[in-house]
Regions:
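A short loop-to-beta-strand scaffold at the N-terminal edge of the catalytic core in hydrolase folds
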Residues: 15-25
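Conserved HGGG/HGGXW glycine-rich cap/lid loop of the alpha/beta-hydrolase fold
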Residues: 23-70
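Conserved alpha/beta-hydrolase catalytic His-Asp/Glu region
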Residues: 136-139, 151-204
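Conserved loop-alpha-helix segment in the C-terminal half of the alpha/beta-hydrolase fold
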Residues: 208-243
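Catalytic active-site module of serine/aspartate enzymes centered on a nucleophile-bearing elbow/loop
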Residues: 234-273
Length: 273
């Protein structure tokens, strides 16, 4: 029998007038992997992935976005630079050197902005189910995301929206009926719209792992291919089968394996320690 999974500790980090709750687990002196969640959702979405990364010897940090858990800060009049600054404060506070920053869906834009604004804090980024295009998602997709988070709708309506926007055929979306923060979702969407997609598009000069679901209505395989063509050797693409936009919930083993494999390339001859 292996050791039981380590429960994360919870700390609050100050970033000027902002307070960011951080879930931390794994080797305290291990190489740092930071996990950033999707639009309107929190750090718990990464529970299964974080456990696997910590078990591989890495120090795993999960900052809660503003408005979730104990994280507090302005939600109006901000943009992606502000969200990236929150994550920068977390990495700097940890003091273990540049981190491998993993962004799921909306979190991928925050990861790319952080790599642009603070390259000294970013060893590499992973873009997970990334809508990498320079235009916003189509109206039907945006509406499905709103419906997924809208507790005033019937369960059947929300399941239909979740299945369309987030889950591949055959994958049960009902686990994502919970975990939504509509006010945070709206604030993050406005912040994203206030930020030109040109600003974060290239992720600075960081190496990029691109985890591409094979059934994603928001993040298309063709977009991943075009992104690699533009940035060449900086980009490594891994397609995650039988998954859609909620890939970290649908295929946590495959996502974790890809992240661990890439981390071992970033830090050769180490297992996180």
């Amino acid at each position: 029998m292996g050791a039981p999974p380590q429960a994360p500790t919870r700390n609050v980090i100050a970033n000027h007038d902002v307070r960011i709750e951080v879930l931390a687990q794994g080797e305290e002196r291990g190489r740092v992997i930071v996990l950033l969640p999707s639009l309107g959702r929190g750090a718990s979405d990464f529970d299964a992935v974080a456990e696997r990364l910590a078990g591989a010897g890495y120090r795993v940090l999960r900052p809660q976005p503003r408005g979730i858990g104990q994280s507090r800060g302005p939600l109006a009049g901000i943009d992606l630079h502000d969200y990236a600054s929150d994550v920068a404060a977390v990495i700097a506070h940890e003091g273990q050197g540049p981190a491998f920053v993993v962004g799921h869906a909306f979190g991928n834009r925050v990861a790319r902005m952080l790599a642009t604004d603070r390259p000294d804090l970013v060893r590499a980024v992973a873009l997970v189910a990334a809508n990498i295009g320079k235009a916003p998602s189509p109206p039907r997709v945006r509406q499905a995301i709103r419906n997924s988070a809208d507790s005033s709708l019937s369960e059947a309506e929300r399941v239909e929206a979740l299945q369309f926007a987030f889950f591949a055929p055959g994958n049960d979306p009902r686990g994502w009926l919970e975990g939504w923060h509509p006010e945070v979702l709206q604030a993050q969407r406005i912040a994203g719209d206030r930020t030109s997609r040109e600003e974060d598009f290239a992720a600075g000069r960081a190496p990029i792992l691109y985890l591409q679901p094979d059934h994603d209505p928001l993040a298309h395989v063709a977009d991943a291919t075009a992104y690699k063509e533009q940035f060449a050797e900086r980009v490594t693409i891994v397609v995650i089968e039988r998954s859609s936009h909620a890939v970290i919930a649908e295929q946590p083993d495959a996502v974790s394996a890809a992240l661990i494999s890439y981390a071992r390339e970033l830090w050769p001859d180490e297992s996180g320690e």
